[in-house]
A protein has these predicted regions:
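Conserved NAD+-utilizing ADP-ribose enzyme module
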Residues: 1-134
Length: 134
């Protein structure tokens, strides 16, 4: 993802950033978070805890500012998202936060919606003969 594409994604409304996340993660099999001594955790406007996720390292890196200064992008694969991260954050009462930007919270879908949307995109890719690019 080049700088102009990153800039374009940052300027999209939350829903379109979410749709971009679903497409990109299903296409690449990669998900990114920010880590320092532990994973970056945010909050919604009403105080709910959020685990922010990004579809690229460049988008994650842009958010390594303010309270997340010193955090670095860390990749994990789609299988880890399905098998480990989503079940763990759901059990902990933490929402997934999709493609935060330096200036705006990301969309916070339910765990079930995020899983269903990613699985639907993966099925769509499989039916067209495409596998995630590693």
């Amino acid at each position: 993802m080049d700088a102009s594409e990153t800039s374009s994604v940052v300027n999209l409304p939350k829903q379109l950033r979410y749709e971009h996340f679903i497409r990109r993660v299903a296409d690449t099999g990669q998900v990114w978070g920010l880590v320092r001594d532990g994973w970056a955790i945010g909050k919604t406007g009403d105080g709910a805890l959020v685990f922010p996720l990004w579809p690229t390292d460049a988008l994650a890196q842009q958010c390594a500012v303010l309270e997340w200064e010193g955090y670095v992008p860390q990749e994990f694969d789609l299988q880890e998202l399905f098998d480990e991260l989503l079940p763990q954050i759901e059990a902990d009462g933490i929402l997934p936060g999709i493609t935060y930007t330096p200036d705006e919270y990301g969309l916070t879908p339910s765990h079930a919606r995020l899983r269903a949307d990613l699985q639907a995109r993966l099925r769509q890719r499989a039916s067209s003969g495409n596998e995630p690019v590693e």
